[in-house]
Amino acid sequence: MSDRRPIATLPDLLISQIAAGEVIERPASVLKEILENAIDAGARAIEVRLEGGGIRRIAVTDDGSGIPPEELPLALTRHATSKIRSLDELESVASMGFRGEALASIASVADLTIISRTRGAEHAWQIDGGSLQVSPASGPPGTTIDVRQLFDRVPARRKFLRSEATEFGHCVDAMERIALAHPEVAFRLFHHDRAQRQWLPADHGQRIRDVLGAEFVDHVLPVQAAAGAIALMGMVTRPTAARARADRQYLYVNGRFVRDRTVSHALRSAYADVLHGDRQPAYVLYLDIDPGAVDVNVHPAKHEVRFRDSGAVHRFVSQVVGQTLAQTGGAEAVPAGVPDGAAPDAAYAGEPAAAAPGLAEPRAPYPAAYPSPGQSPYQGSPARPHTQVPFRLHGEPAGIPATDWQSLYRPLPGDAAPAATALRAAPATPLPTADEHPLGQALAQLHGIYILAQNSRGLVLVDMHAAHERVVYEQLKRALDDRALPRQDLLVPVVFHAAEKDVALVEEHETQLNELGFEMRPSGPASIAVRSVPALLARGDIESLARAVLRDLGAVGVSRLLTEQRNELLSTMACHGSVRANRRLTLEEMNALLRQMEITERADQCNHGRPTWVQWSVNDLDKLFLRGQ
């Protein structure tokens, strides 16, 4: 056995190098810390110069307030800061930095020089991170921080750095995140003295366009809402513009870029019904909340936060984004007054227009699925009786009679008998305007699968099964939302072993569990008894269901498992209950489906995230036939 080593205080340099291991991971980490200091100093113009991807040099110049010469040595001292003075200030901190560790940590693993000049000073002052000697220097008002030879003093850390190109890419990412949070600040980036990026002061929308490009902005929906002390604004992509990678997801809490699982879970919930496969939404969201309601002192790099009431934040974000996505269909699907050539370069030219900022006004009472028997979708058209047999469930959910479910399926009006293959001449009616009928008027059915329609912009092609599937699905969801959630009492409670933290969750979230349809009680210090569950899920694995709900509650403070399970069931029902391919529809039936799509939320995608319709403008069609060329 080796001899015991006595306890000793570590040298300051080693302490700073250990701290640097938590904060300084690569050149991009250095750049982030320096940029945040510049923002806190009130800078309105920041210039960044890199060499070797930031490995050899990172120089950041700002026009902020500067540092007085007598405070320069303190700037390189650990835990010295101008941002906070007490615990109360820490708990409500609004600045980007507050720990007082960044510059000291950087100086311990690289050569660092600071040149700073306060406003009104005759000249600038300079300090070297090694000698800590302060000397006169020349320079404009503001601060320049020059970092060279990163990790030369810690060779083991330098071995983990990637190529110059890779590290430069990370530096660009770090700068983009800061630039998106502060559009009022001008940024310039040089690499080996070559200009790489330049962003002028702008509003949030223009800065997002400047940083992420028109390809991103042309396919987004604006988000803006507030409730009490919490507000959310920004942009989220339309479902049809979702990406294969989660690489364009920017969340800012009180101006600070963070990665938060509560908000991420809320966004996934909002997109649950409209994303296809494993596609990922892109977004730039700014969440403003009372600084006292969020803890930013979770990680030295300040990439994580902790909300005091994570459940409330989750519900707010999920509801706001969900309502934004819901309003993309219907009357806003094809904007009026858009030039023919203005269709975006998206996967589908018929993507919906951006909804107006803010929460949409409540819609009118939800209409019946289709016009009642004997009623035509267009006034003046002959009424036809319907003969479609209602869809029947093979096995209805426990606790809900089959007749209740079947009543949710309203048949298409009109005779279901196959129509003549020849296109009948439709009555001469004026072409509806975009305001009246955005999806236009049906012309014909193609291969028993698609509906061809004409609107004020051009040609609309609708996948009738996918469209009807979404309509029926939304009707089913709304019908269930309007009724009390049935609960199934268990004859014999299901008791299972659980960790102490899960037992505590049951006690803490008793009210929320009851609202979800669960009755759970601790049956001992390490066991839980389930006495009742939602009737929809009564035939499932009760223990696995309970554990999954508790896992969600422990992770993000809320559980959407019941909603997800319910929606999965309703999606299957809607798929089987919607009009099938190769069914011949009359023009009245086609128009009835188009009208129903226009008033149905999320009608642009089916339940599986696939598009339900696409738009070709007259200009698009002219190009196909080389007209006007």
Curated annotation (Swiss-Prot):
Belongs to the DNA mismatch repair MutL/HexB family. One of its GO terms (cellular component) is mismatch repair complex. Residues 364-388 are annotated as: Disordered. Keywords: DNA damage, DNA repair. It comes from Bordetella parapertussis (strain 12822 / ATCC BAA-587 / NCTC 13253). GO terms for biological process: mismatch repair. It comes from the Bacteria. One of its GO terms (molecular function) is ATP-dependent DNA damage sensor activity. SUPFAM superfamilies: ATPase domain of HSP90 chaperone/DNA topoisomerase II/histidine kinase, DNA mismatch repair protein MutL, Ribosomal protein S5 domain 2-like. PROSITE patterns: DNA_MISMATCH_REPAIR_1. This is DNA mismatch repair protein MutL. This protein is involved in the repair of mismatches in DNA. It is required for dam-dependent methyl-directed DNA mismatch repair. May act as a 'molecular matchmaker', a protein that promotes the formation of a stable complex between two or more DNA-binding proteins in an ATP-dependent manner without itself being part of a final effector complex. Coiled coil: none annotated. The keyword Acyltransferase does not apply. Residues 371-382 have a biased composition (Low complexity).
